[in-house]
Swiss-Prot record:
It comes from Haemophilus influenzae (strain PittGG). Pfam families: MoaC. Catalyzes the conversion of (8S)-3',8-cyclo-7,8-dihydroguanosine 5'-triphosphate to cyclic pyranopterin monophosphate (cPMP). Substrate binds at L75, C76, H77, M113, E114. Belongs to the MoaC family. This is Cyclic pyranopterin monophosphate synthase. InterPro entries: MoaC, MoaC_bact/euk, MoaC_sf, MoCo_biosynth_MoaA/MoaC, Mopterin_CF_biosynth-C_dom.
Length: 160
């Protein structure tokens, strides 16, 4: 069985020592789904939201969040990300927004948490901007889609 890397032999939480690890190109993709009413989604897609461009704001928030993940998640390393991408896709048939993020770097540790944080904060930003018109927006299916470049190998999530 694989052990938790952030727990020492005394059961205490510690940041993993990556100093001896080789630098490799590492990449991770994550997603989040935001479900809302047809009216709220239409308002966003048609650009009629009184706070401005919801997707542009959520995209920038996700990018900023990825860069600051180490400040939010206690045992994450500060990383020099070489790429952060956040894409938002309206799914009109299900009244949802699919958020997909991509983080990439050449380094000693993975970027899964950065990708997950980017997708999560983009979703939270949509909620924040739309809560005045709809309080029961649902954020769900925040998950890692794919990661590559590390010792643990290439991971691809199963389709849901």
């Amino acid at each position: 069985m694989t052990t938790f890397t952030h727990i020492n032999s005394q059961g205490e939480a510690n940041m993993v020592d990556v100093s001896a690890k080789a630098e490799t190109v590492r990449e991770a993709r994550a997603e989040a789904i935001v479900t809302m009413s047809k009216e709220t989604l239409s308002m966003i897609v048609e650009g009629k939201h009184h706070k401005g461009d919801v997707f542009a704001t959520a995209r920038i928030a996700g990018i900023q969040a990825a860069k600051r993940t180490w400040e939010l998640i206690p045992l994450c390393h500060p990383l020099l990300l070489s790429k952060v991408e956040v894409n938002l896709e309206p799914l009109l048939e299900t009244n949802q927004v699919r958020i997909q993020s991509l983080c990439k770097l050449t380094g000693k540790t993975g970027v899964e948490m950065e990708a997950l944080t980017a997708a999560s904060v983009a979703a939270l930003t949509i909620y924040d901007m739309c809560k005045a018109v709809q309080k029961d927006i649902v954020i769900e299916y925040v998950r890692l889609l794919e990661k590559s470049g590390g010792k643990s190998g290439h991971f691809i999530a199963e389709e849901k």
